[in-house]
Amino acid sequence: FLVSVPFFKIIRMSDELPYRPCVGIALFNQDNKVFVAERVDLPGSWQMPQGGIDPGELPEEAAMRELKEEIGTDHAEIIDRTEDWLCYDLPANLSRKVFKGKYRGQKQLWYAMRFKGEDSEINLHTEKPEFVEWKWVKLKSITELVIPFKKAVYESIVEQFFWIVDSDVNR
């Protein structure tokens, strides 16, 4: 007795949702260490500044705005950008909470920037604080600090921006 079962693919609802267009910033100090901060809403979870691109806004404008909004200063200059969008999916429970179910995750253009200010200019007590603590770390170590669902994106950032750590360019 044989039963023919048609082939089908199980698709999670989130697989059909779009990615939210965003930017991320790898902010390097003069010692070629990168800025990371611990999230207010996820204790123990560290990340670099990132955020959405507003309608009509250029990605590099969004990067400078996000820097100012999240760390209180935009005293930086762009030195590089990822060639392609880097994407990650949010876990379903976070996607519903963070994006009200409109997006499956984020697609990000990442900018490497050189911080031109003093550490004292960094202020996490912004209008809508996202971070509780910050530090400068070696680029390679950021993958150990980030939440697991962002790890692949951060590994790509390390690979694409590693030339900065290995050179004296833009010091």
Segments (PLM) and residue ranges:
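Conserved N-terminal beta-strand and adjoining loop/helix that marks the start
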Residues: S14-V34, G52-P55
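Short, charged, solvent-exposed linker or helix-capping segments at domain edges/interfaces
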Residues: E121-T126, V146-P148
